[in-house]
């Protein structure tokens, strides 16, 4: 008993008693009317659809957005040849400005800001230097979570800010799962306990996690016997006492990011990838007592054609994640850095290590971290590391990081489990944009990045540049809402509507239903794995991908062993702004994340499909192959 009531454990015991004492007040969640309506999508209509009493066009609505060339044409009309004298002498400068907001950065946060602002009635343009989700947002652990380890930090180290972060993330977890049900799912995660002390500690911690989200749309945590745990996870070493199972969410991060960009475009925003901001446009208006020119727009360069556009706007938001300081330095060369960068390495293993519907958490690795082992797209995703990192483009995992992850799995594995680098199908490194009041020098190993807060930071410069940075995937929507609120208040922008993104379905989510894959099998004669993949990747747009596949005979697989088909390449170019083969293997499909070697095999076929659509010459095709192979090098360790 003394051990259980040790000093380090007392906060958890007290908190656990509190949870048990007041859990009766949590009650059942009264689902809001919107969610009720979404979950009861015309059962009769779905039955009629499945029985072919109505056509797909009576139920599904194809997403309509401007193509990239159409968006550039519209941008050209908006673009003004910047003349400093004319801008300063204009009696009504607002007449020169057609856009309310420019967003720099096409990751989760940037596309979230663009969608929030455009859906309120603002006129928005978003510019991304590379592809949507090409940076940090595609390289996550794929979890939609409150952050159970941050809860431990909040309680054990008495950090109220961490508790606030957990509560916000738990609320946003539900919003994300509801708005993109095809791209996300609830996922039970098992925490193994090798002592009664650990079992008690983990159980109380998970019950606290439940308490801070006292609604019934996410199942509650529970204790599980060692026998059941061994049955599900036979790789575990002997000595298990029990395990605790808690619930979080999982999503396809890149597909989610692309859906955000498409939804913003459907709302009317200009969402352009491969457009780099090379200059900030300013006038000579003095902001109060600060001798700082006011920001009035940006100059962008189309990286595919080299053409430049000067684009005025009332406000500019910097949402470039770990690269935000470079934009801040464009605005003010004196600006101090605010980013403490951290690298997060993940590896992909074959799918036979854990169940397809349950994850595993190593609660404490040998250096005090946590490690997730998760099912993802038929494989096993393992990660992550958390080390200081230089801020570079296209980071590559280090051999030592891959070995660390493999060793961390072995800590909980029985001797019969053989794991080595030869089984790693792919690996990647993402850079977390952590915000620190006292940023460490990049690569400074004396500062533990795992101790830097995951909260976001929102700030405005003297020129009016608004920077949003930090946070995590799960809280992208609330971060975007806070950003647009600041845009409206600081730049006096009136919007006819308030924020509606809490209940705004993303492209593919509005009319998705759980048996859509069966409809695809029956009506398009698709193999089961391909139908399942299309339903979960495209949601209610999947029938249009399947229809395209049947019409032009592009229902063949891109590579054996995976459900990706040729029609997805055409669809990605025509409907999802894919401009390179890398976009296809990395972000429209997830092939490069699942299997580096198979992605390389698929490249020639993908390039041959894209070439006539994008008018590539033979020389351009060779260049594309080389560029894509260079990208694939970042999906292996060095």
Swiss-Prot record:
It catalyses: a quinone + sn-glycerol 3-phosphate = dihydroxyacetone phosphate + a quinol. InterPro entries: DAO_C, DAO_C_sf, FAD-dep_OxRdtase, FAD/NAD-bd_sf, G3P_DH_FAD-dep. It is found in: Mitochondrion. Its main location: mitochondrion. It holds the Pfam family DAO. Keywords: FAD, Flavoprotein, Mitochondrion, Oxidoreductase, Transit peptide. Pathway: Polyol metabolism; glycerol degradation via glycerol kinase pathway; glycerone phosphate from sn-glycerol 3-phosphate (anaerobic route): step 1/1. Its EC number is 1.1.5.3. One of its GO terms (molecular function) is glycerol-3-phosphate dehydrogenase (quinone) activity. GO terms for biological process: glycerol catabolic process; glycerol-3-phosphate metabolic process; glycerol-3-phosphate shuttle. FAD binds at residues 100-128. Its cofactor is FAD. GO terms for cellular component: mitochondrion. Belongs to the FAD-dependent glycerol-3-phosphate dehydrogenase family. PANTHER family: GLYCEROL-3-PHOSPHATE DEHYDROGENASE, GLYCEROL-3-PHOSPHATE DEHYDROGENASE, MITOCHONDRIAL. This is Probable glycerol-3-phosphate dehydrogenase, mitochondrial. It comes from Dictyostelium discoideum.
